[in-house]
């Protein structure tokens, strides 16, 4: 009897091994396909740290072979569906489903890159897996009126906000020191809860002529290059928000945990490819924004800014509490970028109208509003990941977690696994 049971166990393990091998081959096909699309669409691949053997061997064609890619996507999705239906493993089903979600985004991005038009809602649903709530003009007016009561002084709400914020503008010659200090402290906070690989590190560079404020270029092997755009003025809160978002416990930590736990420990080859326009980005951006508040609860953020960052920047600490109170209210206006993206993509709003919305309802200066328009024109519905992605991640992490330590633990689970968007809702 023992021999028979042992024989059955061998058969089971053998069957599981064959199934896993088949899924691995599909995962390799997914990576090859993504890298080949990336030969044409320079924004398609955000990071890749897998084997060189999966990179394209042939030079790209003179024209974008959209139909070829769409056909390959369709075949691969069908193969994944078949593999999932035959599998008795919940982990394998989830893995196949996660890759399929990514491939749905591949399909939409290929269509966008080839010039096919779609509405904002279809695009956001296919790329990021969500239906994005609409925020009316009345919504923004309500919070503007609330801010008007909070901000004292003459002039418009925008002028009053700018008068307050300019007190906390970081001098250009202090940016390096302030940001490196913020990143180092963010790492300390994160290391209290996550075991970080000894070899991990982030470098910091300052750049110009970009449509974004900060970017994490993940290099693989637990290394990142963080870039901060200095085209526009950088205020003191951004030293924490951007630095933490891009590094600890944001993008750098998200990528290294996936690499360690899935690619290196489990051999999930698909995780070595990070396609920018995919459901993975909703979790990446949402978790990076949520992680700022986790590492810097309001009281700690205020104390660290007041006692450490402002003195380093050579700035007066008077008014910082009121400034942070206003910024907390102003967060409610972040959805304005979604509505501007919706209007521009759907053709119901001109760039000039979009800029007016950003200045009026987002309390953005004209240079920042113009830079935001540039971002939307390039990245389109991607903007929803920063705010609606944050909402979904916050709901996921804070459900049934009563303490900060429990939230850190659930947050770590989110950053270490192939979590599908449906699991967040």
Locate the predicted segments by residue.
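Bacterial Sec-dependent N-terminal signal peptides
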Residues: 1-22
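N-terminal maturation segment of proteins
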Residues: 19-425
């Amino acid at each position: 009897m023992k021999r028979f049971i042992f024989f059955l166990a061998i058969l089971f393990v053998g069957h599981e091994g064959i199934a896993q091998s088949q899924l691995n081959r599909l995962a390799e096909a997914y990576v090859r396909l993504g890298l080949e699309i990336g030969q044409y669409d320079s924004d398609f691949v955000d990071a890749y740290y897998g084997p060189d053997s999966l990179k394209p061997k042939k030079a790209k064609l003179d024209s974008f072979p959209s139909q070829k890619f769409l056909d390959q996507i369709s075949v691969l999705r069908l193969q994944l569906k078949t593999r999932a239906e035959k599998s008795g493993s919940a982990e394998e089903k989830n893995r196949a489903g996660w890759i399929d979600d990514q491939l749905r985004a591949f399909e939409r991005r290929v269509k966008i890159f080839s010039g096919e038009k779609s509405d904002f809602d279809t695009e956001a649903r296919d790329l990021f897996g969500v239906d994005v709530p609409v925020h009316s003009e009345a919504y923004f007016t309500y919070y503007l009126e609330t801010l008007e009561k909070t901000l004292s002084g003459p002039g418009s709400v925008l002028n009053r906000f700018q008068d307050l914020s300019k007190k906390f503008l970081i001098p250009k010659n202090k940016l390096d020191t302030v940001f490196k200090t913020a990143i180092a402290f963010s790492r300390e906070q994160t290391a209290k809860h996550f075991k970080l690989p000894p070899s991990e590190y982030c470098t910091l560079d300052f750049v110009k002529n970009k449509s974004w404020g900060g970017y994490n270029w993940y290099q693989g092997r637990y290394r990142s290059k963080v870039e901060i755009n200095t085209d526009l003025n950088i205020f003191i809160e951004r030293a924490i928000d951007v630095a933490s978002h891009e590094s600890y416990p944001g993008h750098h930590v998200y990528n290294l945990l996936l690499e360690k736990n899935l690619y290196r420990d489990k051999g999930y080859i698909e995780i070595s490819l990070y396609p920018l326009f995919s459901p993975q980005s909703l979790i990446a951006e949402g978790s990076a924004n949520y992680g700022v508040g986790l590492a810097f609860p309001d009281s700690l953020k205020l104390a660290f800014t007041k006692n450490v960052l402002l003195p380093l920047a050579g700035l007066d600490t008077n008014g910082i509490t009121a400034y942070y109170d206003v910024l907390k209210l102003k967060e409610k206006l972040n959805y304005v970028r979604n509505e501007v993206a919706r209007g521009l993509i759907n053709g119901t709003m001109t760039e000039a109208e979009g800029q007016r919305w950003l200045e009026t309802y987002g309390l953005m200066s004209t240079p920042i509003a113009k830079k935001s328009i540039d971002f939307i024109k390039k990245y389109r519905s991607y903007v929803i990941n920063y705010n609606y992605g944050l909402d979904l991640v916050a709901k996921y992490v804070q459900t049934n977690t009563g303490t900060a330590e429990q939230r850190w633990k659930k947050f770590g689970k989110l950053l270490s696994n192939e979590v599908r968007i449906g699991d967040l809702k």
